[in-house]
Amino acid sequence: FLRN
């Protein structure tokens, strides 16, 4: 979720 950090980069999505």
From Swiss-Prot:
Alphabetic keyword roster: Amidation, Neuropeptide, Secreted
Disulfide bonds: none
Alphabetical GO biological process terms: neuropeptide signaling pathway
Residues with PTM Asparagine amide: N4
Residues annotated with 3-phenyllactic acid modification: F1
Tissue specificity remark: Neuron specific.
Primary site of residence: secreted
A GO CC annotation given for this chain: extracellular region
Keyword DNA-binding: no
UniProt keyword Magnesium present: no
Cellular localisation: Secreted
Official protein name in the record: Antho-RNamide
Protein source organism: Anthopleura elegantissima (Green aggregating anemone)
